[in-house]
């Protein structure tokens, strides 16, 4: 974990800078950080259906707690939702429907970033069997060379285009599409 006060103070050095960071631990955010130039700090609360979070990030804040933390964080700084990674599998839209309903029921309507699953091919050697079942779907995935020369896996672009449209259509049932800053 980082010394966030040090990071935030760095961004105070120049009026043109703004910090933005994603977290899976919004309930552990220290109150003293609220004082540090809140108008120049953006927190992106990472959300995914709890079913996926239980497998992929078992030691992080549970999704409902993350959602419930957002109104408090909004009192102090700009808050976005980071829907990432977006996982595709049978029934995936039902899982995201439940998630969007929970966010809407909490009265949250903020900008968001949406990122479909991309993962490093070498990670497969370290993944548990449950993680592998969720992440590794070679019939619908392809290799992608990253800008850092890593071998990454992502959903095939032809399929992903349709996934993005389905995700956006579902999102639009709950929120204004203009809330999506980017989706890929």
Segments the model singles out, each with a brief description of its role:
Residues 1-32, 36-69, 78-82, 113-117:
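Core AdoMet radical
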Residues 53-55, 88-92, 122-126:
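Short acidic/glycine-rich loop or secondary-structure boundary segments that cap or lie
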Residues 101-184:
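Auxiliary Fe-S-binding modules of radical SAM enzymes
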């Amino acid at each position: 974990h980082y010394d966030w006060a040090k990071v935030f103070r760095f961004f105070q050095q120049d009026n043109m800078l703004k910090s933005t960071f994603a977290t899976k631990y919004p309930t552990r955010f220290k109150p003293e950080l609220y004082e540090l130039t809140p108008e120049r700090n953006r927190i992106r609360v990472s959300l995914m259906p709890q079913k996926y979070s239980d497998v992929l990030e078992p030691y992080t804040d549970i999704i409902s707690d993350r959602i419930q933390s957002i109104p408090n964080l909004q009192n102090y700084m700009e808050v976005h939702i980071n829907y990432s990674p977006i996982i595709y599998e049978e029934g995936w839209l039902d899982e995201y429907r439940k998630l969007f309903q929970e966010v809407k029921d909490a009265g949250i309507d903020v900008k968001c970033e949406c990122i479909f699953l991309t993962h490093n091919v070498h990670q497969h050697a370290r993944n548990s069997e449950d993680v592998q079942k969720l992440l590794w779907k070679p019939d619908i995935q392809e290799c992608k060379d990253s800008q850092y020369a890593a071998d990454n896996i992502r959903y095939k672009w032809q399929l992903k285009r349709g996934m993005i449209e389905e995700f956006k259509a579902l999102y639009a049932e709950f929120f204004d599409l203009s809330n999506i800053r980017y989706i890929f």
